[in-house]
Structure formats: structure tokens, C-alpha cells
Amino acid sequence: MTAKAPTLRRHPRFRSAILDHARDIVVYLPPRYGTARKSYPVLYLHDGQNLFEPERAHVPGQHWRVGETLDELIVAGRIPPVMVVGIDNTGTSRIQEYTPTSDARLGGGRGGDYGRFLIEELKPFIDRTYRTEPGPASTALGGSSLGGLVTLHIGLTRPGVFGSLVVMSPSVWWDRRVILSTVRRTRPRPALRIWVDMGTAEGRRALDDARLLKAALVGAGWTAGRDLHYAEYEGGTHSEAAWAARFGAVLAWLYGGPRV
């Protein structure tokens, strides 16, 4: 028997006055959302094109299988029902929006405005439209590559909105590793649970950068195994397929079992 397709709700051309851009938003709803009158935790993920549908992915056919993975884990009772909000990038403005500072060679630097869009425009809309648990303990933010970079930047500079951050294969290299300085000067330390990972086949520099990020977080007061999870994935590449392969582990860390 063919498995039922995940339940997705679409909000085409969602407009941001802050960024002066429109983008598609896709919302995953857990099984029984329509009949179980309860509220749900929410995970916001960047690069929404790559999450749910292979035909929309940046590399055709390569997507994270977010809906299928969630359905499998929820139905099996391994995690509670949760919602996911996929936020499309805008293509040519992706670097602008996913970077915290302007790099002398590559430009960028609108990550703060992108964070405002998420917090002041998108999240209030989602909380009005769906049955969410809106507090930080039930609200997570995540992404990969530059999406991982901007996730950490937003979480550190706009505390009290997101309680957990998923930072996959982060672009620590951006603007001479400026994110490390942000970590070191963030005081007081926000109440955040942080996942950081890197694949061993993403390059020696990327792996070294991830280890520097872990060290900076530990130095700033996070504790590995408590509110910081750090993982290196043997043979993991910088690709949608690699992130899809460990997305189930991310969900288990976020929602399954002890909160570590």
C-alpha cells in the first residue's frame, strides 16, 4: 500500500515589508492535526525549496524528505507531533539574507533584517494561522551551510524567541569567521540548546571551523552533552542528501527523549 503523502499547506508569495521580498512558505502539519484539538511545537527551517518536494529542490531530486521523516517518527511514537515551517530562499538574495555581516569580497550582511522578518512578520502570522505553542521552549530554528550560519546569528542576537537551534554544516568561514566573535561576546549567554554538526568529507577547513565553533560555544558557557550537541558524520558531504540522512537524528535530539 502506498504511504499517505505528508500534509503540506502552502502560502505562496508571502510578502515581507522588512526585506521587500516575497517568498513561498510551506507548512508541514503532523498526522491528525485536523482532528486533534491541540497545539504544537514549531521548527522553522531555511531553504524551504529543499525540504519537502524533490521537484522543487535546488538540485532536482535531492531534498531532505522532511515530511516523510516526520510522519515516520511521529507515527512510530519516537517523537511527539510537531509542525515545520519551510521558508523558501529568494535565490539571488540568499547570500544577502543568510549572512550577518558584509564580506569585502562577497557582499551580504542582511541577516539581521532576515531575523526581523522571521520574528516580526512570519512567526506572528504562523501563530495566528495555526495552533502553535508559541513560546521559546517550543520554537526551534534551523538550517544548513549559510542557513546554519544565520540560524546561530539570529539565535544569539535575538534571544527569547527560539529555544533550540539546529546548525548543520555551518559556513563558519564567512567574513573571517565573524560568527566566532559573535559567540565570544554574547553576554549573558542565551538560554539556547544548540546542535552543531559537520561531515568529515566537507573539507579539512570546514571541519576545523566546526571544531573552532564548538570550542567557542563551550568557552561561552555551553556544555557538550547538556545544552550543546556536537557531531561529526563520517563521510558526510556538503549536500542535501547528507543533511536528509541525519535529519531524523536532529528530530530525535529536538523532540525525542531527554532534553540534552
Regions found by a protein language model. Name each.
Residues M1-V260:
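Non-catalytic cap/lid and distal C-terminal segments of serine-dependent acyl enzymes
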